[in-house]
Amino acid sequence: MQETFKFLRCNSQGEAVEDKYSLETLKNHFVVRDEYNNLFRVFSSRDDFWEWEAAQPFEQKCFHEVVFGFLPQRLKFDIDFPVNKSYSNDNVDENVDDNVNDDDNVYDILDMIINVIMDVFYETYSLPYNINLTREQILLTDSIGLNKKRELKYSFHIILYTHSVLNNNEAKAFTSKVLENLPKHVYPFVDPQVNKSIQNFRIIGSHKKGSMRVKMFNEELADVFETSTTTKKSDTLIATPFETTCLPCIFTNVKETASSSCDTIQQSELEEVLKFAGTLCKNHCFLRVHKNLVLFKRTSPSYCEICKRMHDKDNTLILRVTGNKVYQHCRHDNKHSLLMGSLSGTNNFVETYVDQVMTKSIEVHESILFEELPDPQKHIYDESSMREYERVPTLVVKAQMKIGKTIQLRNYLQKYYGNNSISKQQTIRFVTFRQIFSKNIQSRLPNFTLYSEVTGDLDSYERVIIQVESLFRLTSTAEPVDLLILDEVESIFNQFNSGLHKYFAPSFAIFMWMLETANYVICLDANLGNRTYNILQRFRGDVPIFFHWNQYKRAQHDMYYFTSSRETWLNNLLKDLLEDKKIVIPTNSLMEARLLQSFIQKKFPEKKIGFYSSKSTAHERESHFNNVSYYWGLVDILIYTPTISAGVSYEDKRFDVLYGFFNNMSCDVETCCQMLGRVRELKSKCYKICLQGKQNYFPETIEDIEMFTLQKRDTLFQTISNHQLSFTYSKETGRPIYYKTPYYHLWLETMRIQHLSKNHFITRFINQIADTGAKVFILTGEKLETVKQYTSIKMEIKHQDYVNIASAETIDANKALLIKQNLKEGITVDQQDLFAYEKYKLLEFYAWHGHKITPKFVEQYNSFMTKQNYTGRVQISRGKTVYESLTMLQTQELNFHQWAMQHAEHHDLQYNYSFQSHMYAIMLLTKCGFKCVQDPNILTNEQLMAKLVDEFVQYDLSAVSFEFKLKKPNKTDPQTILKFINKVLGLRYGLKIHHNKGNYYIKNTKAGSLIPFVRQQIKQSPCVVSNLLPITETSSVKEETSPIKETLTET
């Protein structure tokens, strides 16, 4: 039985379905759109429709199911491939054979879409709710054939026929998640508009009017994709009043959302996560990341440790990251998983990673672009000494320390620039990165002039050894230099970003002139990287690079023991000291170096300790580093920071073992590894290393760093809209144009290396050591009562620093400037003057001159976080409104940027622009429903959660994550978003959105409580004068007054 209607909705032109049937009564009927006759047909049941449909002539079978959004429905996808489109495998999958036809290309993309659907289903329903989906539960139909223009067209419907969702909003959200995870080139093939509130969806056996392409089952297709072979017509219908499993309501229910929360794996974490796949990658290859899941494609059958059987179909392997733990999952068993290990920053990550290196489950060698040069441009060998260098315009030499790089360089100079050579009077410039290294080189090349031993013009000297900061003493001439030597070339590039240049612009200009124009360039470095390759290609690209690489593993007899446990490391150190061993201790932490010195002195007062850091006097560094054989021969324990690097080498076999302590808060991995080689010979060849590093999320590709850098400057040229703090480009200033200078490109390369170290410090450190041929092990040992003592000494050292600064002389601006200049010039400064200078800087920062300060004041207000929050509050409180404050800050930073781009570009790149960080922080705050940083408003749980869902589900937080170096949150989970927002507010202002008894309001963090907002300047403590919203009784001032007074009245 059926009824026909001209229209679906009520109107004045005729009878409509809606005139007779309510939405409630339509639940029990089957509504079909008859495209051929332009009618809507309402059947009492599906069986009535099938019976009637079978009797219709073929050309009139143009039927579409009318799916009402409020009804439960199957998840469905409409896939269309445009006519005459070329589906190149280069855009599909690197593992697909190049010689395939168009059918194969379409099928590759279709298979990719099915995989992504399964991945999203797994993350959304399988993990939280233990609901499975296999390929056998996916129905695939097609309507391949000629369209109206007689052109071949591919069209497919994918239906998850055993499951249904509550309504079209759930289906729409699931489809959006699938689209988010598809590659950009695949996205256009999937129709995103198939989940409307009223949706027409073609019925099996039907075709579109005027087209002969019939929607049908395809057994061959099902066999290819291993999908369902069902031919039951009702399984293809979308509206599902009964026969399916109804999935939980995920996307339209805030409370449900939290239960399935997960963090997205960042690019900086992916490398570490993939290491855990280890031998599993023999049968799988990496496919992509989806939220907190790493997905793999099967390449061959494999045994599953979870299911305890072989799998030969499906992409069953999944790695899930929860917190910092990495778990292995199988699609066929959602109840069980295997713990693979922990990401860096956790206690056992170092040990887990070393174990994988020991079992050769990880490839430790990081290939560089030089290795990809064609064979005629490479000389690669494995010998215990260096071969003769090639006479080529651009020569790059890589080899480990003590294999004879400098010996061969001397031979090269003698052969081509010696007394009997035609080039003996040609100009040679030997550039180094440290003054002490320059002196070391001169001792081996006595016929070169050392820049620091002569005054005035250096151009008159044919052969000069010069440090990068003094390059301004050279000038460009009509004739280029004949030979430019860059020893430790990676460190030279680093030095241009050190901020230590007094005359940066002329020094960098002469460096680039020599690099671009020199007849011959030789670059040498044991830690050669892609930065050198990219710089040479960019600025010497007119001549080919020749790569000379001796792969000899000189460190193959060295043994490295790694741990993340300071306690284990300290206990081993104490044991060796008790056995009277002589020990070397390099560390990239000044505090750790001071702590170790004090700790050892208390335990072993009879031992002589050599200690070198940035705090060592200039006289001590110069005299000792020029004669390390004597001075280091006097000590039992040698402790040093990165102030000692290349150029300082102790050759005697005096020390027994090296203990290194490194973290990712200081210099990069390459510098840390270089520090290990200052004592060349250890009796035991034993290195015991403690590595610590929190997880960071810095951009680490040139493209991302450049995008982030230019974006911060772009915002300075935009007009701020006071409504919802949005941006438009200013008509007056327009969009900025950036001139990408040589320094800009070098700076990007240097940032990339620094960010890689900050993000992957531990893995890169261990990899670089293992790549030298050294053996790596896990450091173990007995536990002793050392950590408490160690921590106690650390607190004593810090407290003494606070006392020394608080009690230091109060100096004026003139004396502070003199001390600053002496430090910059390397002139020795008295220790008491250093403390006085620190005190001056602290008082100057808070404009607190004339006030007496205590050690407690120094402890609280000299911290990085308190200073950062104070600066943020001052900047956002300058105007009468947040909008006005932002505009003032934007104008100030825009003026500086324009000046810097005209006068000193390096200042612009090294300047920390803060306007964008304020824009993001305030934007997050306003999206939550607060007007500004002092808004006393209180939101209910329901209000805030609704805001978090409405405002952030569609908002891309990538730029905010980049700005604050935070992990991007899962946008479907309000609590995760709130946690992310609080991190941003805490970093910028010392604030958080606090929850108490079902309500949310703005509250100070611990650091923020030290710097209250006030209407007028007060004499109690450093504070921020603010003209923003009125400060009420519930605001922060009242709650913070007490601890401030306690701080300042302490004696």
UniProtKB/Swiss-Prot annotation:
Similarity comment: Belongs to the asfivirus F1055L family.
GO molecular function terms attached to this record: ATP binding; DNA replication origin binding
SUPFAM superfamilies on file: P-loop containing nucleoside triphosphate hydrolases
Cysteine pairs bridged by disulfides in the record: none
Name this protein carries in UniProt: Putative helicase/primase complex protein
Induction (free text): Expressed in the early phase of the viral replicative cycle.
Domain of life: Viruses
Function of the protein: May be involved in DNA replication.
Keywords: DNA replication, Early protein
InterPro entries, sorted: P-loop_NTPase, Replication_origin-bd
Pfam families assigned to the protein according to its UniProt record, in alphabetical order: Herpes_ori_bp (PF02399), Herpes_UL52 (PF03121)
Claim: Iron is one of the keywords in the record: no
GO annotation (BP), single: DNA replication
